[in-house]
Structures are given as structure tokens and as C-alpha cells.
A protein has these predicted regions:
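Small-molecule kinase domains that catalyze NTP-dependent phosphoryl transfer to phosphate-bearing small molecules
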Residues: 95, 99-148, 160-162
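Conserved substrate/cofactor phosphate-moiety recognition/catalytic segment
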Residues: 2-46
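Glycine-rich phosphate-binding loop used to anchor ATP phosphates in small-molecule kinases
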Residues: 33-85
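Conserved phosphate-donor/acceptor-positioning beta-strand/loop module used by diverse small-molecule
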Residues: 75-98, 135
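Conserved nucleotide-binding/hydrolysis micro-motifs of P-loop NTPases
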Residues: 15-16, 59-60, 87-92
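Short, well-ordered secondary-structure micro-motifs
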Residues: 21-22, 64-65, 94-97
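Short, hydrophobic alpha-helical segments
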Residues: 153-158
Length: 162
């Protein structure tokens, strides 16, 4: 089996799907529920020492307050936040996007949606207020990306130790 970090993965779309099952997307109650779910998971994972990967598409600068709040929440209970920006060639991104696995788990899988979001927001910039690792994963397997992240941030992982 490919090496893994052993970290739990909390995909952004999971909180969205949960809230959307009850509230219309974009409404105030929807936003409040998404927010409560995310921050409850962040805080409890950090408090309990559960290593967590949270995935989302960062829109600069609109999402900076969210990132700062995540960091404050996690660090406030003794956790650590390691920001990672994954990038790849636009052609490769567009080729990967329609993969059935992405749609199956609720991730963005539409080229039209990507183009709309990229036209409306800056989704290719790093978070300006925090250190972050940028990894070009154009030619890398997920396990290789994980190893780079673990080594860069000196994260505990038996499978990646020197």
C-alpha cells in the first residue's frame, strides 16, 4: 500500500453537504451551520491531539479572515496549523477535475465551475499572512506530496522518518 501520514482528512465539501441537506446553499442559516461544523471539528481535533488535514480552495484575500480564525482556534487549544498550497499546471488541473472520484465525494468536478470561480476569485495565491508550503503536484503522486509536507513541517509519521 502507498505510504500515508495517518492524518484524518476533513474535506471542506463535507461540512457544506451536511448543511445543504437542511438549508439552501448560500443562505445565512447555511453559512452558520457550515461554520459551526468546521470549527467544532477543528477545535475538538486539536484538543484531542488528532492530526487533521482540512482541504479547501483558498480565495485571496476573501478567505484570509477564515484562515486566521482557523489558526487562532487550533493554536488556542494547543494545536498546530501547517498551511500547504497545492498547485499544478492549468492543463493538468483541468484534466484531473472531471475525474469521477471527485464528483463521487462531492468535490468540484466541473470545468465550467472552476473557470467561474477562478474568474471571480484569486484562487492561485498563497495566504499572505501565514507561512505556507507550496507544492507543485503536476508530476507527483499523492504519497510523494504527503512526504514533502511531512518532511517540510517535521511532522510525526513512522512511514516517513529518516
Amino acid at each position: 500500500p502507498p505510504p500515508t501520514t495517518g492524518f484524518k482528512v476533513f474535506h471542506n465539501h463535507v461540512s457544506i453537504a451536511c448543511a445543504e441537506s437542511v438549508f439552501d446553499f448560500g443562505t445565512k442559516p447555511f453559512g452558520r451551520v457550515v461554520d459551526k461544523i468546521r470549527f467544532a471539528v477543528f477545535e475538538e481535533a486539536a484538543r484531542e491531539g488528532v492530526s487533521l488535514v482540512f482541504t479547501f480552495v483558498y480565495a485571496c484575500p476573501e478567505d484570509t479572515p477564515f484562515v486566521e480564525r482557523v489558526c487562532e482556534t487550533v493554536e488556542g487549544v494547543g494545536g498546530r496549523v501547517c498551511l500547504v498550497r497545492l498547485v499544478c499546471d492549468r492543463e493538468v488541473l483541468e484534466r484531473r477535475l472531471p475525474h469521477p472520484e471527485r464528483a463521487r465525494v462531492g468535490k468540484m468536478a466541473s470545468l465550467d465551475m472552476l473557470r467561474e470561480v477562478a474568474g471571480r476569485y484569486d484562487i492561485f495565491s498563497p495566504v499572505p499572512t501565514r507561512e505556507s508550503l507550496s507544492v507543485d503536484n503536476t508530476a507527483l503522486a499523492p504519497a510523494e506530496v504527503a512526504e514533502l509536507i511531512v518532511r517540510h513541517y517535521h511532522l510525526p509519521s513512522a512511514e516517513f522518518k529518516d
